[in-house]
From Swiss-Prot:
UniProt subunit comment: Monomer.
Record: residues binding Mg(2+): 173, 193
Keyword list, A-Z: Cytoplasm, GTP-binding, Hydrolase, Magnesium, Metal-binding, Nucleotide-binding
Enzyme class, first EC level, given as a word: hydrolase
Annotated protein name in UniProt: GTPase Obg
Obligatory cofactor(s): Mg(2+)
Gene that produces this protein: obg
GO cellular component: cytoplasm
Lineage: Bacteria, Pseudomonadati, Pseudomonadota, Gammaproteobacteria, Candidatus Palibaumannia
Source organism: Baumannia cicadellinicola subsp. Homalodisca coagulata
Stated family: Belongs to the TRAFAC class OBG-HflX-like GTPase superfamily. OBG GTPase family.
Amino acid sequence: MKFIDEATIIVAAGDGGNGCISFRREKYIPFGPAEGGDGGNGGNVWLQADENLNTLIDYHFQHNFHAENGKHGQGKNFTGKCGKDLTIKVPIGTRVVDQNTNEILGDLIVHQQYLLVAKGGLRGLGNNHFKSSANCTPRKKTNGTKGEIRRLQLELILLADVGLLGLPNVGKSTLIRAVSAAKPKVANYPFTTLVPNLGVVQVHKKQSFIIADIPGLIKGAADGAGLGIRFLKHLERCRILLHLIDLAPADQSSPVENASIIINELKRYSEKLATKPSWLVFNKLDLIDKREALNIAQTISDALNQKHNYYLISAMNHQGIKTLCRDIMLFINKNK
């Protein structure tokens, strides 16, 4: 199924039913008291997180949603039936924004979590509500109020513990294939990854973490170049970022300059994202002498003022991966 992580929908809660003007009329009571019933409340609109969904594609085809209106009141003090609530299911990780005010209404991050997005209108009152000892036959009632109408921006932000960052073709997809059961496309050309991929890394029997791979970033990504900038939001909820660096770029580019590109683009996109815990992971150790790899890694680590230890791995040969995954698990457990 196509991965769609943004959608716009219009939700309308139900209107409240009107109150009724009615009087008791029986054979021997020609001018009885008021007995007009109240209307029913309008139905609310809710969003509900569903772990069985992973895309917002359905809402690219259906944009308008309306809860049921409340029924009008009737004679003999019959209250109108309340309108049924409408529940719209969305993937876990969906952020809901009111497009008119840019207010974030909520984040749905737990299975079956509910969020009220449009409140139904209140019921109108029948004339029975307005009778008194001085006036038992009032000709007064109120109409139900209108239900809320909202234009909502739905943004799916993946829930992952670890996010992979890097230029195109540095081996992010190869790494996620090596450490999990995920099977993203892998090929020797840029932008093989077109959408984010998630993988579950099982470190021990009862310990695992989720890792996210997004399309590679390029210089100018913060200005819209390439594919990765659109998907950077999926790293917002990650606890730690792994910055993958190619030790032996096929285009003979400088690993130091390549590392700086990612750091700069991340800062330009979001200072908050740029300050997340980030580890340097140097990939393709199988293509270069280990001593040379250590020199490159140390140079880049010093240039970027990296405080945490860096890692040398070969995603292709699974070299150094076990240690990396173990340390990630320790970090996650420590920072819960």
